[in-house]
Amino acid sequence: MDQHQHLNKTAESASSEKKKTRRCNGFKMFLAALSFSYIAKALGGIIMKISITQIERRFDISSSLAGLIDGSFEIGNLLVIVFVSYFGSKLHRPKLIGIGCLLMGTGSILTSLPHFFMGYYRYSKETHINPSENSTSSLSTCLINQTLSFNGTSPEIVEKDCVKESGSHMWIYVFMGNMLRGIGETPIVPLGISYIDDFAKEGHSSLYLGSLNAIGMIGPVIGFALGSLFAKMYVDIGYVDLSTIRITPKDSRWVGAWWLGFLVSGLFSIISSIPFFFLPKNPNKPQKERKISLSLHVLKTNDDRNQTANLTNQGKNVTKNVTGFFQSLKSILTNPLYVIFLLLTLLQVSSFIGSFTYVFKYMEQQYGQSASHANFLLGIITIPTVATGMFLGGFIIKKFKLSLVGIAKFSFLTSMISFLFQLLYFPLICESKSVAGLTLTYDGNNSVASHVDVPLSYCNSECNCDESQWEPVCGNNGITYLSPCLAGCKSSSGIKKHTVFYNCSCVEVTGLQNRNYSAHLGECPRDNTCTRKFFIYVAIQVINSLFSATGGTTFILLTVKIVQPELKALAMGFQSMVIRTLGGILAPIYFGALIDKTCMKWSTNSCGAQGACRIYNSVFFGRVYLGLSIALRFPALVLYIVFIFAMKKKFQGKDTKASDNERKVMDEANLEFLNNGEHFVPSAGTDSKTCNLDMQDNAAAN
């Protein structure tokens, strides 16, 4: 009999160990799947940011409209965040995250689809690509007393071309795809973190969040690498003979294979969604047992948390909840500390989002860097410095055991240092390019403060040139001309990228003495002084990014500690909504609108409508781009000072040292900063349990 009991106990012990292993493995599988979803999410976000200039050129749109497309991600997120935050924890969280990843991937693929329906990219009005012949039309030169063929185009052909170019309205699909990506990303962070908080071993949540923080950095690494690679590839690669393309990646009309990045990120997101559909709602229960006792489990959970609603009083509870919501909202909005910190955070985030959206365009236009080179350099700069800064910020707060006021001072100090380094960008603004008819007169002697936009001169007045054409050539006098015709060039030799033009009358009038009045395709390169400024800019960017990331880890910690504990979820949710609406959506739009004001030459399509900008006034561009960022950050620093004095008054003499719980929030803050302002929603599920504790509870119940 004793032997029989011993065998039963041994079997029960083995069964218990097997269940324990299965349950722990379920949680580990969730962590692995969530890690892949974080990589996919970060990859998609980086791909959109580095492709925004390519999209602007491909669809022939302004920077402000491109900014609206970029902000559509936040629009999609705002559409469902309330539903996800409230109902998400009550439903099957892994499956919701899986659906989100699936939508995220679908949105990325939808973004790339217009490429397959728009036809071949025409970088010039004279570019007519015939895949069967693998050739392009010849460039126009100065034809005295003759009329160029494009001036004699029949209205029927013009109207036909206009209809074809109306395909540029397919940017709407890019807008919708990015918005769908925003909808899909919404559940990943809040539901993922709450799931970890519910089912991780006691005290291990911070470790898991820190690991997600580190793993999430793989996404930007892959994104910048792919962005740099695809930016080198011509947009219609695989469809046209690349030897017939006469522009290079440094040309302002160059469009890389932007669509490939979205295809890759979309497929990666879809693949990352698959594991979530096979994970249980509760990893602490086997799948069959969970299905049988689902209703009992829900009732038990609600009893444990004192949240069971009386079904007969649902109407009263809804009214009470609505009233309580508005009372809570009033409470945080009448909290001076919260309002001040909300405003300064909004200003700083708006400055960051606006400047980061157009930093690639800035490097291209200001320093003459190709999109591929800009993506590669920014990736090398951003990833290690941001990771180092985030770690350093958390280490300093923990090492010196900073009080809440001390954390606010630390945040202000890092913001001030970053602000001062940002001021150093202004001396690094390069002079505007020497472009005849835009920044200087055709004789090359009279520079003008703003572009003159007078393409015709006596040296090309008899050439019958198309004034709207943008086919830049660089004269051997160092001046860029809008086209070979407007340079007065009479003849040419060579083909495609290697074409050289001769007998250029407008080059001659500048007083060049060598009698070799020639020009070659493309804009004149930047001088050595501007190149040196670029490397200084990169060095300052490294330091600036380091201090920004070091102080950026404090935002969520300060937010949750300046309001009542029961209001911190609402405080973070409301802050996220305001920042997404006024920062994530609006900042790229008004940054882009002001950048558009610095454009010197716009493209025009066959319909005669304005398209994308071909060249900017470098000086004005730099002042607007940097000045707007400074204009947003300076009042934020003033508000920081007010915030610190107000905190001293409120917390003077109180012990506000960082607790273990605050250090947990710091890990979550690092995660939040890495993922560009994603939402953090505190746990709304069951209480945290370890696998061991859950087994003990079950044994006690039996």
Curated annotation (Swiss-Prot):
Positions where Phosphoserine occurs in the chain: S293, S295, S683
Pfam families cross-referenced by the UniProt entry: Kazal_2, OATP
InterPro entries in UniProt: Kazal_dom (IPR002350), Kazal_dom_sf (IPR036058), MFS_dom (IPR020846), MFS_trans_sf (IPR036259), OATP (IPR004156)
A single Gene Ontology CC term: plasma membrane
Keyword entries, A-Z: Cell membrane, Disulfide bond, Glycoprotein, Ion transport, Lipid transport, Membrane, Phosphoprotein, Protease inhibitor, Serine protease inhibitor, Transmembrane, Transmembrane helix, Transport
Outcome after substituting I292M: In a colorectal cancer sample; somatic mutation
Catalyzed reactions per annotation: estrone 3-sulfate(out) + hydrogencarbonate(in) = estrone 3-sulfate(in) + hydrogencarbonate(out); 17beta-estradiol 17-O-(beta-D-glucuronate)(out) = 17beta-estradiol 17-O-(beta-D-glucuronate)(in); taurocholate(out) = taurocholate(in); estrone 3-sulfate(out) = estrone 3-sulfate(in)
Extracellular side: 49-67, 120-168, 238-255, 354-373, 426-537, 596-629
Record Gene3D superfamilies: 3.30.60.30, MFS general substrate transporter like domains (1.20.1250.20)
PTM statement from Swiss-Prot or TrEMBL: N-glycosylated.
Ranges annotated as spanning the membrane: 29-48, 68-88, 95-119, 169-197, 217-237, 256-280, 332-353, 374-397, 402-425, 538-560, 570-595, 630-647
Places the protein is found: Basolateral cell membrane; Basal cell membrane
Tissue spec. comment: Highly expressed in liver, in particular at the basolateral membrane of hepatocytes near the central vein. Expressed in the placenta. In testis, primarily localized to the basal membrane of Sertoli cells and weakly expressed in Leydig cells and within the tubules.
Activity sensitivity to pH: Optimum pH is 6.5 with estrone 3-sulfate, taurocholate and L-thyroxine (T4) as substrates.
Membrane topology of this protein: Multi-pass membrane protein
Protein function: Mediates the Na(+)-independent uptake of organic anions. Shows broad substrate specificity, can transport both organic anions such as bile acid taurocholate (cholyltaurine) and conjugated steroids (17-beta-glucuronosyl estradiol, dehydroepiandrosterone sulfate (DHEAS), and estrone 3-sulfate), as well as eicosanoid leukotriene C4, prostaglandin E2 and L-thyroxine (T4). Hydrogencarbonate/HCO3(-) acts as the probable counteranion that exchanges for organic anions.
Domain writeup: A conserved histidine residue in the third TMD (His-115) may play an essential role in the pH sensitivity of SLCO1B3/OATP1B3-mediated substrate transport.
Name of the protein: Solute carrier organic anion transporter family member 1B3
